[in-house]
C-alpha cells in the first residue's frame, strides 16, 4: 500500500516537473523545441534580386543618429494614419523611453498613405507631416495603408533599419495595440546575446567606427536571432473575403501548412537576421500576412524562429503589476487608455519604483500565473 502511494506521489512529482519545464518562468521546454527546428531546415537559398519597395515619403534618415552610442534596440511600430491616439499613448508610456538598462532604445512608427476616399482621414497627409515634424518618429512609405499591405509596410521598415540604422543590435517589430516591457526586453536580449560587458565594451568602437564605401564596419557581430511567440503548422485560410485569406495561387495546397513563424504582434530580429531576410525575401511568395511572410523568408535563409513564452503573441493579459512589470515582454489588444494604465501600474510615470513588482510566491509561479489570469478572464 505504501509502495503504491509512493509511486503515485513520484508520478505526480514527475508530471509537475514536466509541466514546470514546459510552462514555467523560463519556458525552457518550448524554447528547446523551437531550437531543434534549425537542424530540420533546408540549406539556405541563394540571395534574390534587390527588393522593389515603395519610396519613403517621410524617410526620417537621421532618427538613429546623434551623440552617444547607437541604439541597442530599434522598435518599429506598425500603425495606421488615423491611429493618432494609439501613437500618443505609446509616446506617453513605453515608447517614450530613450534608454533602458543603460542602453539606448529608439521607437519609430511605420505607416503608409491614408485612403483618399475615407470620409474622415482621407486628407491627413499634411497632418502626418506636421506630426512627424513635431515628434520626429514617423516613417511613411508611398503605398495605401491597409491590413493587406502589412507585408509591404514591414519590409519597408526592415529595409530602412538596414540602411539608416545599421548599428542597432536588434529590431522589434510590433503593433500600436501592444504594450512592450522595454526594460525587461532589453535585459532578455542582453542575456541571449552575451554579457553586459560585451555590449558596453563594443559601443565605443562602434560609435567611432570607420565608414568605407558607405558600409559601416561592425566591431562585433550579433548572432542570428528570430525571437517570438511561435505558431506551428498553421494552414492557410481560404475563406472568401476573409482578412487572413491566402489564395491557392499565393500558397498552393500541395505546399502544406506554413512553416513555423513568430506572431506579428511582437517579434525580435537581430541585425544579422534582418540582413538575411532582406536578401532572400524577393524569392519568397509575396503573402499578405506579414508574420507568415517573415517566417517563410527566414526558413528560406535557414533561420528558425525561437520560442519565447514572455512574448504574448495574440494573447491579451489583464492588467497585473507582477505580469506587466516582470514576466511579460508584450501584451496584445490594449487601447490607448489601457496602455497608459499599464504604464502607471508599473510605475513608469514616476520614472522609478520603490517596491518589487512581484511577491515571492508570484515570482515562483512566474509566467504560469500570468497565463492562468488571462485564461480565467478570457
UniProtKB/Swiss-Prot annotation:
Highly expressed in heart, skeletal muscle and pancreas and, to a lesser extent, in brain, placenta, kidney, liver and lung. The chain crosses the membrane at residues 9-19. Pathway: Protein modification; protein glycosylation. Residues 20-378 are lumenal. Glycans are attached at residue 149. GO terms for molecular function: ganglioside galactosyltransferase activity; glycosyltransferase activity; N-acetyl-beta-D-glucosaminide beta-(1,3)-galactosyltransferase activity. GO terms for cellular component: Golgi membrane. It comes from the Eukaryota. It is a single-pass type II membrane protein. Its main location: Golgi. Its EC number is 2.4.1.62. One of its GO terms (biological process) is oligosaccharide biosynthetic process. It is an enzyme of class 2 (transferase). Residues 1-8 are cytoplasmic. Keywords: Glycoprotein, Glycosyltransferase, Golgi apparatus, Lipid metabolism, Membrane, Signal-anchor, Transferase, Transmembrane, Transmembrane helix. It catalyses: a ganglioside GM2 (d18:1(4E)) + UDP-alpha-D-galactose = a ganglioside GM1 (d18:1(4E)) + UDP + H(+); a ganglioside GM2 + UDP-alpha-D-galactose = a ganglioside GM1 + UDP + H(+); a ganglioside GD2 (d18:1(4E)) + UDP-alpha-D-galactose = a ganglioside GD1b (d18:1(4E)) + UDP + H(+); a ganglioside GA2 (d18:1(4E)) + UDP-alpha-D-galactose = a ganglioside GA1 (d18:1(4E)) + UDP + H(+). Involved in GM1/GD1B/GA1 ganglioside biosynthesis. This is Beta-1,3-galactosyltransferase 4. It comes from Homo sapiens.
Amino acid at each position: 500500500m505504501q509502495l503504491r502511494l509512493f509511486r503515485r506521489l513520484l508520478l505526480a512529482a514527475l508530471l509537475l516537473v514536466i509541466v514546470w519545464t514546459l510552462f514555467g518562468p523560463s519556458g525552457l521546454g518550448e524554447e528547446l523545441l523551437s531550437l531543434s527546428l534549425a537542424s530540420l531546415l533546408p540549406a539556405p537559398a541563394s540571395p534574390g534580386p534587390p527588393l522593389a519597395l515603395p519610396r519613403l515619403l517621410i524617410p526620417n534618415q537621421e532618427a538613429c543618429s546623434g551623440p552617444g552610442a547607437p541604439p541597442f534596440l530599434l522598435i518599429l511600430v506598425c500603425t495606421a494614419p488615423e491611429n493618432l491616439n494609439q501613437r500618443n499613448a505609446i509616446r506617453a508610456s513605453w515608447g517614450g523611453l530613450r534608454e533602458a538598462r543603460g542602453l539606448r532604445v529608439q521607437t519609430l512608427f511605420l505607416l503608409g498613405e491614408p485612403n483618399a476616399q475615407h470620409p474622415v482621414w482621407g486628407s491627413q497627409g499634411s497632418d502626418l507631416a506636421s506630426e512627424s515634424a513635431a515628434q520626429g518618429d514617423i516613417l511613411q512609405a508611398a503605398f495605401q495603408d491597409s491590413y493587406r499591405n502589412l507585408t509591404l509596410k514591414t519590409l519597408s521598415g526592415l529595409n530602412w533599419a538596414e540602411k539608416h540604422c545599421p548599428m542597432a543590435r536588434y529590431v522589434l517589430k510590433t503593433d500600436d495595440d501592444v504594450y512592450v516591457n522595454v526594460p525587461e526586453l532589453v535585459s532578455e536580449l542582453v542575456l541571449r546575446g552575451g554579457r553586459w560587458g560585451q555590449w558596453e565594451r563594443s559601443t565605443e568602437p562602434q560609435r567611432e567606427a570607420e565608414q568605407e564605401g558607405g558600409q559601416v564596419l561592425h566591431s562585433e557581430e550579433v548572432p542570428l536571432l528570430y525571437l517570438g511567440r511561435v505558431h506551428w503548422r498553421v494552414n492557410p485560410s481560404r475563406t472568401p473575403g476573409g482578412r487572413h485569406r491566402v489564395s491557392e495561387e499565393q500558397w498552393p495546397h500541395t505546399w502544406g501548412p506554413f512553416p513555423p513563424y513568430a506572431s506579428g504582434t511582437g517579434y525580435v530580429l537581430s541585425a544579422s537576421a534582418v540582413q538575411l531576410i532582406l536578401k532572400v525575401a524577393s524569392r519568397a511568395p509575396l503573402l499578405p500576412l506579414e508574420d507568415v511572410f517573415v517566417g517563410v523568408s527566414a526558413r528560406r535563409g535557414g533561420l528558425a524562429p525561437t520560442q519565447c513564452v514572455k512574448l504574448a503573441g495574440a494573447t491579451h493579459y489583464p492588467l497585473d503589476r507582477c505580469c506587466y512589470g516582470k514576466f511579460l515582454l508584450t501584451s496584445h489588444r490594449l487601447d490607448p487608455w489601457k496602455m497608459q494604465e499599464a504604464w502607471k501600474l508599473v510605475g513608469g510615470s514616476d520614472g522609478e519604483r520603490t517596491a518589487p513588482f512581484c511577491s515571492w510566491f508570484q515570482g515562483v509561479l512566474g509566467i504560469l500565473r500570468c497565463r492562468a489570469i488571462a485564461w480565467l478572464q478570457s
